[in-house]
Regions:
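Glycan-recognition and catalytic cores of secretory/periplasmic carbohydrate-active enzymes
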Residues: 1-108
């Protein structure tokens, strides 16, 4: 029978282990790109499909799972930064999701 050895090295020096790394990723790398390219300025709704160079492609249908992910991201960005623009977009997304994402026929 072989023995399995588990070892945890000291990872305190790794940047991925610190909250500032993830906050900076969200607020400086991820959210600015989505705010600049991922939202249709006419409707303030997220594009459903984007090409690798951030050009809208495909359908314009809004899917609850997609909207839920955006709502989570916007809410997290607001909690991390306190910036009102994230809160405003989160509220807009939540309202749209509640209004259009509810299945009145089956109650969910």
């Amino acid at each position: 029978m072989r023995k399995v050895k588990a070892d945890c090295s000291d990872s305190t020096g790794r940047k991925e282990m610190h909250g500032a790394f993830w906050r900076d990723q969200a607020l400086h790398d991820i959210m600015p790109a989505w705010l600049a390219h991922g939202i249709n300025p006419a409707s303030e709704r997220f594009y459903t499909g984007l090409s690798r160079d951030w050009k809208p492609i495909g359908t314009t249908d809004q899917y609850p799972t997609m909207l839920g992910r955006h709502l989570f991201s916007l809410s997290a960005a607001y909690l991390l930064s306190g910036e009102e623009r994230y809160l405003r977009l989160a509220k807009t997304t939540a309202s749209y999701l509640i209004e259009h994402g509810w299945d009145h026929e089956f109650g969910g």
